[in-house]
């Protein structure tokens, strides 16, 4: 039987085959069961993870195995169409598996010894972060810290499963422990610093802005009407700045600014 795949569907499936074959080889080498991620990681047609269905499939499948190898970063729709997570999606796969088997801890082995206080490409020899909360990690991951996929915390967080980021090349390092909360006094006042490119700022100034009820809502409504998501909105007494993604704003800049400048 030959199945013909065309366009992006073929590209997505092709991208997953290396991981699939690597999993097959690893399972054979270790003598473990091989579980194809396409059979247990469920996506909808739009490429969104179906978390509840995935958890059911994983729990049922893994309850029959003492040891198993599961390829990362891809899954499939109910009809077998292969879908993938975004870059680094194997972290999410590991988190989903940890939740399904009610693991005591999710060890994520990578090529660095956990998170650092700041980017080593900018700051020389930054200090490692020994422990960090899920919330702090979520902020750092979204703003550019790429050690762990930003969505990997959700499955394990609900179950209270800690994550330990470890270094494959330096297994003796303790890495970074990610938990719901920590009573340990941090070494530094600031947990970490990360940055993300590709934003632009719209600065708005108006006298007595702070006393005008609904002004901020009216401004943000303009962006919503144009289909532009905002990232951050710092404000002062007479000033307001809206940070948006540059690629979303460029084609709609003039129309957005016209609506913002219109008297209300």
Label each PLM-derived region with a short phrase.
Residues 1-7, 12, 258-264:
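Single conserved hydrophobic/aromatic residue that forms the stacking wall/gate
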Residues 2-3, 84, 90-93, 110, ...:
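Ser/Thr-centric signal marking residues that sit
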């Amino acid at each position: 039987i030959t199945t013909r795949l065309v366009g992006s569907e073929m590209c997505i499936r092709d991208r997953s085959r290396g991981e699939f074959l690597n999993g097959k080889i690893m399972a054979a080498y270790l003598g473990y069961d091989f579980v194809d991620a396409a059979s247990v990681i469920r996506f909808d047609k739009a490429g969104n993870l179906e978390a509840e269905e995935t958890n059911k499939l994983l729990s049922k499948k893994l309850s029959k195995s003492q040891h198993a190898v599961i390829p990362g970063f891809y899954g499939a729709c109910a009809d077998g169409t292969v879908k993938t997570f975004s870059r680094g999606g194997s972290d999410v796969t590991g988190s989903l598996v940890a939740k399904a088997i009610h693991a005591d801890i999710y060890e994520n082995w990578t090529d660095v010894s956990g998170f650092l206080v700041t980017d080593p490409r900018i700051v020389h020899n930054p200090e490692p972060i020994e422990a960090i909360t899920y919330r702090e990690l979520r902020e750092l991951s979204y703003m550019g810290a790429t050690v762990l996929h930003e969505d990997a915390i959700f499955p394990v967080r609900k179950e209270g499963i800690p994550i330990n980021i470890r270094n494959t090349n330096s297994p003796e390092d303790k890495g970074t422990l990610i938990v719901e909360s920590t009573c340990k006094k941090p070494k530094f006042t600031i947990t970490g610093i990360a940055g993300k490119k590709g934003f632009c700022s719209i600065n708005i100034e108006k006298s007595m802005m702070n006393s005008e009820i609904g002004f901020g809502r009216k401004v943000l409504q303009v962006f919503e009407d144009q289909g532009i998501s905002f990232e951050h909105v710092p404000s002062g007494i007479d000033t307001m700045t809206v940070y948006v993604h540059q690629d979303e704003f460029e084609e709609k800049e003039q129309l957005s600014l016209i609506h913002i400048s219109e008297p209300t």
